Amino acid sequence: MKDKEIKEEVLKEEINKEVNEKKKCECEEGKEEAHEHKNDEHACCGKHNHKEEIEKLKAEIEEWKNSFLRKQADFQNFTKRKEKEVDELKKFASEKIITQFLGSLDNFERAIESSSESKDFDSLLQGVEMIVRNLKDIMSSEDVEEIPTEGAFNPEYHHAVGVETSEDKKEDEIVKVLQKGYMMKGKVIRPAMVIVCKK
C-alpha cells in the first residue's frame, strides 16, 4: 500500500471518528448543550428531557399542596363554626320550655294576688288547679308522662323508700306513692318514690 493510500485511509478513520463523536450523546450533568432536542426528546438518543418533566411534577405537587392547605383551612373553619352553633344550642336549649312555664308563673302570681285581696280560698284553689292543668299540658307537649304506680313494684320505674304490711295488697305491690315519677320520650327522668308491701 502506497503512502498516499495509507494517508487517505488514516484520514477517513479520523473523519469517521469525529462524526461518531458528534453523534454520541453526552448525558452527564453540565453537558446538556451537546444535546439536540426535538419534541422533548434528545435527537441523538431518543431519551426524554427529564428536567422538564421534573419541573412539571414539581408544579403539580405544589398545586396539590396548596389545594390541600385550602381544604384543611376550610374544614377547620367549618369545625369552629359548628362548635359555636352547638354551644349556642346548649346555651338556649331550655329556652322553649322556660317560655312555656312563664305563663304558669304569671297565673300563680295572679292567683296569690287575687286571693290575698278577696280572702277567697275556693278561688285560689280553682286558680291553682288551672295552673296544674296548664303545667301538665306543657309537659305532655314535650312527651313527658307520669309513671304508672298501680300494681307490682318495678325497679326500672319505681324507687322504694320503705316497706309496710297491707291486707289489701299482695307481696311487692305498691302501697303508697310519696312522689310521682315521670318519663320523657320513654326515658325515666325521675323514678316514682313508693312504699312497697311486705308480708
Swiss-Prot record:
Looking at the UniProt record for this protein, which Gene Ontology cellular component terms does it annotate, in alphabetical order? cytoplasm
Q: Which domain of life is it from?
A: Bacteria
Q: Which GO terms describe its biological process?
A: protein folding
Cellular localisation: Cytoplasm
Swiss-Prot/TrEMBL keywords: Chaperone, Cytoplasm, Stress response
The signal peptide annotation in the UniProt record is none
Family the entry assigns: Belongs to the GrpE family.
> Which function does this protein serve?
Participates actively in the response to hyperosmotic and heat shock by preventing the aggregation of stress-denatured proteins, in association with DnaK and GrpE. It is the nucleotide exchange factor for DnaK and may function as a thermosensor. Unfolded proteins bind initially to DnaJ; upon interaction with the DnaJ-bound protein, DnaK hydrolyzes its bound ATP, resulting in the formation of a stable complex. GrpE releases ADP from DnaK; ATP binding to DnaK triggers the release of the substrate protein, thus completing the reaction cycle.
Q: How does it assemble?
A: Homodimer.
PANTHER family to which the protein is assigned, alphabetical: GRPE PROTEIN, GRPE PROTEIN HOMOLOG, MITOCHONDRIAL
From the Swiss-Prot or TrEMBL record, give the protein name: Protein GrpE
Q: What is the native source organism of this protein?
A: Fusobacterium nucleatum subsp. nucleatum (strain ATCC 25586 / DSM 15643 / BCRC 10681 / CIP 101130 / JCM 8532 / KCTC 2640 / LMG 13131 / VPI 4355)
Gene designation per UniProt: grpE
